[in-house]
Amino acid sequence: MKQIDAHLHVWSGDPAGYPYLPGTPDGIARGDAEFLLELQADAGVDGALIVQPIHHGFDHSYVNDVLEKYPDKFVGMALADPAADDPTAALQVLKDQHGYQGVRINPGLWPAGQSMDGPIGDQLMSFCAETGLVAGFLIEPSHFGQVNALCSRYPETRTIIDHFGSVKPGQTQELKELLALARHPKMHVKVSRFPVSSESEWPYTDMSDTIHGLIDAFGVERLMFATDFPHVVAQCGYARGWQIADHVTPSLTDEQRVWLMGGTVMKLFNAWGN
């Protein structure tokens, strides 16, 4: 069984060579690809989906170089710029020249006064459908209705909701709305960023009911586990971050665990030797 981390970031330790976005705090945590590979080797992790980090903004140079250097280890998800004259132009270049297979859609970057399910969202979803790119949503529960509208208009677009959709334990109505998105057959959910979603300490077992609700609604074949490196290193450590699933879903069958810990993301992105 291959273990694939379905969501993480990498950023350069050389801001002179790969500039950070203005306003990035001084002394940010180490997040380079070589550090990640060391941790993955120790944890028995075979590869990862890299999501373009906000520290580099829309400058994908560092992730481009990482993808080129380690093509068997990593797949890239680009960050869409919804304020660009044509948000799809840069994405097309990243796909064609650097092999990106996904697009992160972050409503927090939308122009003021515009909704994610407006014209820009339509353009991005249509583009993903036409190119085969996977659309990943970094959202909160207040955005579930907009995601539902987009997926209803573009049912052929493969989609992912990151980080449980920011649903926390005890948010029964928000969880109900998240589970309702299972009506879209090509929708997936990342069970990720546990230290932020949880209200308890490692191993964050208060997320168990949420995950089992997702399994019942989506099936484990549409769920994927992720650590959210490098943030997880300071939160609980990479190796312990990878062990979370064994504690919050101890009743998983071997087959279900194969899907959750790598099978789903391997199938969705047709990568890592799938």
Give a label for each model feature.
Residues I4-L8, A48-V51, V75-A78, Q101-I105, ...:
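Hydrophobic faces of well-ordered beta-strands that scaffold small-molecule active sites
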Residues R30-L39, A84-K95, Q173-E174:
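Short, acidic/polar
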Residues G57-S142, A149, K190-S197, E201:
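Active-site gating/metal-coordination segments in enzymes
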